[in-house]
Structures are given as structure tokens and as C-alpha cells.
Amino acid sequence: NGLELRRTIAGMENSMVGQYFIGSGPIHIVAPGGDEVLTRLEQKYYVLPGTKQSYAVEQLVLVVPESLVDAADSLEALSRGTGRLAVADPSHTRLGAQTGVMLRTLGLEASLKGRLDVATDSRGVLDHVLSGQADAGILFGHEAVKAQERVRVVARLEKGYTQTVHSMAMERYCPNRSLCEEFLRYLHSAEAQAIVREAGYGVPAGRRP
């Protein structure tokens, strides 16, 4: 059920592969994060070919202080105003690099020129927004969830950049393949996807029930 999925994903954030108890027994699932690593593991037959299931995508979000009532509700609205936007350093962070690509692709870089507040990393973005140094900031959705008592998400930014897809696959020697298959199918249920969204991730296109 949803609680078990939550525990499984939480465990996988700290360990790439291992036993996770789902229902009546253990399953052996590999969840390395981005699909690039999982594809290499599949090629080496470390995971069972054909079992990879995408369940989440990282997404950028626009955040503002929770206490700010009159806030821009989109990047476009912010670009038309005079507010400052906190972004992570594009030369040292993946967050900053993806943010830069998105702003250029959407044609917003010029309109925000002189109003981009470059922070060291995601923590810096959060600090700049909360201190009033910037009116809004761009974070990954799962980072915004961790700070949801202090900032709120006003827009989910899904266009203009390549989103990182997260998948799981069955370990080659999983002792209970039917149970593994059942769990991998469950990843695409409405219940499981609600948990993924609650954690600040998006659901892969074509995987929505």
C-alpha cells in the first residue's frame, strides 16, 4: 500500500539495492535514481531486462515565502514585473544548469536580466528567498517539499528543460519475481502516484492512470 511504497522509496534514497519488505515478503529492487545508471546495470544483466518501470520525474518549481500574500504566480508574471529571482549557480549545480537552460529556452533570460540573484546551491536559493534578497526562487520540487513550512510552490515548471526520470527495476536474482512484478505494477496506480506527487516529484508522461 502507500505506506509501504513510501518506506521503500525512503530506503532506496540511502541504499541503491537491497531487500525491501512489501506485503508478505521481501522484494529485490534496484533504484539508483536517474535512468542512465539503471540502463547500464540492465546492459550488464545486473537487473532483469524488461522490468524497468519509470515512476517519477524531477521537476523545477517556483517558490515564494509562505507569508508573502501578493506574490507572482508564474515565471511569466515575474518577468513582467520588477521582482528578483533566486537561482542556483549554473556552473556548479545541476539545479542551476537546468534552471539556466529553462530560462533560455522559454525566452525569459533577457527580461530577467539584472534581476537574477545567483546563490551557491539550493540551500542558498532558499536563504535568499526567505531573507527577502529575492522575491521568488527556483528549486527542485522535492527540495521545496522539505521547506514547505517556510515557502510555498506557486508554479510547477515542466517545460524548457530535460527532466530527470527515476525508475526501478527487478534485481536479476530476485527470489520472488511475482511479488516484485506486483510492486512494479503498483507504482503506476493512482495511490502510488499520489505519494510520488506528495514527495515533490512529477509523474512520467504516459504513466498516469
Question: Can you name each region flagged by the protein language model?
Answer:
Residues N1-R6, A10, N14-P209:
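Exported/periplasmic ABC-transporter solute-binding proteins
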